[in-house]
Amino acid sequence: MQYYVGLDVSVKETSVCIIDKAGKVIREVKVATTPVAILAVLTEEALAIERIGLEAGPLSQWLYSALAEAGLPVILLRPGI
């Protein structure tokens, strides 16, 4: 099954929401805004993650780079869409 991840990034915490192809919420959790903490959530189960989206902004560039370097299918989304 395919899974999709949304990240709502703030200075101290990031909300992580994982849904399946049907849109059913599989997991919601808040973690520290660090690549290590976010990667831990995304890799603790062997999920076939199709896409990870986070809003483009001042807090997203370094996080996007870290997730992409880890081989995850991450994209930046334009604010307001």
Predicted stretch roles:
Residues 1-81:
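Phosphate- and other anionic-substrate recognition elements at nucleic-acid/protein interfaces
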